[in-house]
Each structure stands twice: as structure tokens, then as C-alpha cells.
């Protein structure tokens, strides 16, 4: 593979994470405007965004098999057509049913693109370099989560219709579409060149189960925590601006953490540093929940920084449980993480209704403790050392 081809594929991976980050995180910015557009209360409008999450979940799950049937380049180009149709549907329709369908299609497109992006990184890079590259790729999710809410605020403040925000997000996919030209993708399944030697199917091992549970608990814990931090802070008497600043601080330090750990991870055994980070994150979250108001900003800043590498490290370790990176295995762990996203309000909503926001934060803290236990247990069964040893950089 030529170096220019590798760079193009890497940028497709970066932009695939930016696309999903933009679609997921911009929701809160435009929800009120969309509710006004359809003349509905915000509470009922928020339910339609479940179609976006459902599309992401279904596509990540199915793409483990689709990757071996439909070439990756074909998927990305067809995804561009679907993206154009979905954005056009948002622009020219006043039907709530069509809005929900367009959101579902956007979810499908971003889920397929992100699973391809993740797989490309696991194919292009090996050993410790894979972890650092995947972490840098994941930082584009957070970067888009910072940039596109600002774009949305800029457009909405000038009374420009909300659907132009999605047109701007579509430009990210336009860049992916352009990059597919003159670019060779890894062939999979029936499209791959088969050698004379039969391909030995590798067993995943119990370590994959530990990582899948860790992925689900981490995402459910993280989103359950950050979703209720503003309500918890307001309950302590903090202003709305101060409560919002806590969330901004978390994501800002999370992004800086990703950049820092994309360099740091190269020098450590991934399972050991993951266990340390998971343990630190659980302790820091507990200190945030039980600490004083004066210390809360510092605890959430350090929590964001030290927890930033956890999810990507889980995916990287998963890809290293087999000698050859398996798209089905990577997508299985991604699917478990996405299930955590879907369950966020299903799990935390009733807890808040019954016991208040602090109970939801403590539940999230318990889930982080489960992540630590899973990562610790993985140390006894992980195969990543024997598979990545020859490829370590």
C-alpha cells in the first residue's frame, strides 16, 4: 500500500468519527428550534432523536457482515447519496414522519461510516501504534462536538433555519466522498484475494466478553453521568451557566486527554494502563459526587482527562485478541458501546424520578467500577501481548 493511499484512508477514518460526533452532539443545540418548527413540546420532540441512535446501532451491528459482502468504497459512496437524500428530506418536508425517517437514515449512514473508519485504523496500523492512532481518530468525535454546536449557534442566532446545520454536517461526508476517488480500500470476504492455504477461523476468547461488558458499562456510565451533572449541580445551588461550564470542562479536557494519550500509550502495555485509568476514573467520579462545590471543576477536569483513553483502548485491545483484526469482533464491541448509548435514559430516567440526580451519578460511578473489574480480569486472559509483540513500534 502506498503512503498517499494510507494517508487518504486515515483521513476517511478521522472524518467518519467527526461526522458521528457532529450528528450526535449537535442535537441539544437544535432541538428547541425543531420543536418550534413542528409546533411540538421539546419533550416529545426529543423522542424522535431516538431514530438517530437506532440507525447508528443497527448499522454498526449489520456492518460486521455487510463489510464482507459490499466493498467499503461502494458503501461510502452509496452513503453519500443517502446523506444528500436525508438532508433534502429535512429541508423540504414539514412531515414529522419524514423527519424521523431522515434522522434514521442519518444514523444508518454515520454508523456505517464510523464502523468502516474504525476497521480501517485496525487494518492500517498494528501493535501499540494502533491504539494511539485509534485514540487520535476518536478525538475527531469530540472536536466535531465542539465545532458544530458553535456553527449551530452562529446560524441560529442569525435566524437561519435549523436544517442548514445538517447541511453543514453534510460537508464532512462530502469530504469523505471526495477522498474515496483514487483510493484503494482493503478487500474483505469474497472480494479478498485468497491464498492457497485455508483461512483458520480464530476463536475470540473470554477476553472479548470482558471487553464487551466494559464497553457497554463505560458508555452507559459516562453518558449517564454527564447527562445529569447539570441537574445535580443546579440542585446544589449552582447557576445554569456554572452547571453548563462543568460539562464543557469535561469535554474540553477529554479532547486534550485524547491527544496526550495518543502519544503516551505507545510506551505502556495497553491492558495495564487501561486498568489504571479505569480505576482512577472511578475514584475521580466518586470524589466529584461527594466533594465540595469549590473542588467540583477540578475533579471533572481530571476525570475528563484520565477517562478519555478508556473506550478507544477497549476497542484496540478487542482488535488485538485475534492475530488478524476481525471486523466482526471490532463491530461487536462497538455495538455493545452503542447499546450503552441507547440505554442511557432508559436506565437513568427512572432512577432520577425515584431518587434524584445524585443517585444517577452514583449508578454511573458503580458502572465505572465494573469497567475497572473487567479490565483487571482481562489481564489474566488477554491475548494482545502474544499478537502485538512482533508488530510493536
Curated annotation (Swiss-Prot):
Q: How does it sit in the membrane?
A: Multi-pass membrane protein
A single GO cellular-component term on record:
plasma membrane
| Keyword Transmembrane helix listed | yes
| Keywords annotated in UniProt | Cell inner membrane, Cell membrane, Membrane, Transmembrane, Transmembrane helix
Q: List the disulfide bonds.
A: none
| Family matches, as InterPro entries | MFS, MFS_dom, MFS_trans_sf, MFS_TsgA, MFS_TsgA-like
GO terms of molecular function? transmembrane transporter activity
One family name in Pfam for this protein:
MFS_1
Query: Transmembrane region positions?
Result: 11-31, 51-71, 78-98, 101-121, 134-154, 162-182, 206-226, 245-265, 273-293, 298-318, 332-352, 361-381
Is Isomerase one of the keywords?
Answer: no
Location of this chain's protein in the cell: Cell inner membrane
* HAMAP family noted in UniProt: MFS_TsgA
The family classification in the record reads: Belongs to the major facilitator superfamily. TsgA family.
This chain belongs to which protein, by name? Protein TsgA
The organism is: Salmonella newport (strain SL254)
**What are the leading ranks of the lineage?**
Bacteria, Pseudomonadati, Pseudomonadota, Gammaproteobacteria, Enterobacterales
